[in-house]
Amino acid sequence: MNSDSVKKSVVIDTDLEKLWSKISRITKMDWLEGQKSTKFLGEKKSGVGAKRLISFEDGSEVEEHIVGWKPKEYFSYIAVSGLPLDAYHATISIEKNKMKTVKITWESYFASKSTKNEFEEFIVFLSKFYAQSLKNLKNEF
């Protein structure tokens, strides 16, 4: 089994509350690269146990479940379907810096039984996806 991680960060010129308000609306992710729509799956709308289905412009869909939630600090989620992986856990965290900026970090760990080449291609894809999505988010402030 192949396993690896991807971690991307960006500093955004905003305050912590505004950034948390933006990223914690887990179905309002217009900054997510290639996202067409996102909807809730179930009654819970935030916090541990909330579920969402992200539909992408290429027709793919990814179902994610929130498994960690600390307001104004982080949320963690797992993908349960839609990715070419056997395991995927990610955390998006924010940290207040001096000078009214906030550092946002998107980090994930994943594993797959795919071939080494397929796995390496996915790592490149995911790294670019995180970087572009965070750039999109930064551009909204």
At which residue positions do the language-model features occur?
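A conserved amphipathic terminal alpha-helix motif
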Residues: Y109-F141
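Short Pro/Gly-enriched beta-strand edge/turn motifs at strand-loop
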Residues: G34-K36, S46-V48, K72-I78
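Hydrophobic residues positioned within well-ordered beta-strands of beta-sheet architectures
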Residues: V6-K8, A50-R52, E64, A90, ...
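Hydrophobic-ligand-binding modules of eukaryotic lipid transfer/binding families
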Residues: M1-V11, E17, E95-K103, K128-A131, ...
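Hydrophobic-ligand binding "helix-grip"
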Residues: F56-T101, Y109-A111
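Hydrophobic ligand-binding cavity/cleft-lining segments
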Residues: M1-K44
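Hydrophobic pocket/interface hotspot
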Residues: K18-I23, M29, R52, I66, ...
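C-terminal and inter-domain tail/linker signature
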Residues: V62-E63, I104-T105, E118, F122
